[in-house]
Regions:
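Structured catalytic core of nucleotide-sugar glycosyltransferases
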Residues: 1-103
Length: 103
């Protein structure tokens, strides 16, 4: 029986998503509780938000395995995804949209 614990890196880029961040983190946490032999990290790449997104993430970071990467300006999605991948520690990496519009 394989008992190796793997690490899954879940990457999100975002800009001004203060209303979506808490529900998103709760969904990820709930889902990952049922996944055996995997730990996870959530990497949020901030694409120059002007709302309270970063403040919310800093609070959630006290409870959840969250990394925050702040871009120096609004770079757009591709550089943010790349920054998230480069800062991941996982055995596997997935990218999802932070607005929760993916089915």
């Amino acid at each position: 029986m394989d008992t190796k614990i793997n690490l899954l890196s879940i990457v999100f880029s975002f800009r001004n998503e203060e209303g979506n961040i808490k529900p998103l983190v709760n969904r990820i946490s709930t889902t990952m509780k049922d996944v055996k032999n995997w730990k996870y990290e959530i990497i949020f790449v901030n694409d120059d938000s002007t709302d309270k997104s970063e403040e919310i993430l800093l609070e959630l970071q006290k409870t959840y395995p969250i990394k925050i990467i702040n871009m120096s300006r609004n770079f757009g999605i591709d550089p943010c995804v790349l920054a998230g991948f480069r800062n991941s520690s996982g055995d596997a990496i997935i990218y999802l949209h932070s607005d929760q519009q993916d089915p």
